[in-house]
Amino acid sequence: MGQNDLVKTLRMNYLFDFYQSLLTNKQKNYLEFFYLQDYSLSEIADTFEVSRQAVYDNIRRTGDLVEDYESKLRLYQRFEKRRELYNLMKQSLNQPELLKQYITQLEELE
């Protein structure tokens, strides 16, 4: 698995966590098996008794769908920004003015 594949898988795992409640059971199952359980297309196709192409199409469409949700709702983007600010805050505990700036930025995200 290449670096880009790993980054995409990690991103899809986060997007799945944030948006799975908006998906159908079939969409959830396919994404979970593919990205979280690391099943191959063939294994998923065998499990659900469908073609590999059907699995591939569903995963691609569902991936596009969660990316669309993210572009509109930005839950993952805000999560990443909060995580970054928390780390910066930990590093600036001895710098009150800088810490205040980070707290302000964090409050603006809410």
Swiss-Prot record:
Any one Pfam family match given in the protein's UniProt record, by short name: UPF0122
Q: Which PANTHER family match?
A: UPF0122 PROTEIN CBO2450/CLC_2298 (PTHR40083), UPF0122 PROTEIN YLXM (PTHR40083:SF1)
Family listed? Belongs to the UPF0122 family.
What job does this protein perform?
A: Might take part in the signal recognition particle (SRP) pathway. This is inferred from the conservation of its genetic proximity to ftsY/ffh. May be a regulatory protein.
| Name of this chain's protein | UPF0122 protein SE_0911
Native source species: Staphylococcus epidermidis (strain ATCC 12228 / FDA PCI 1200)
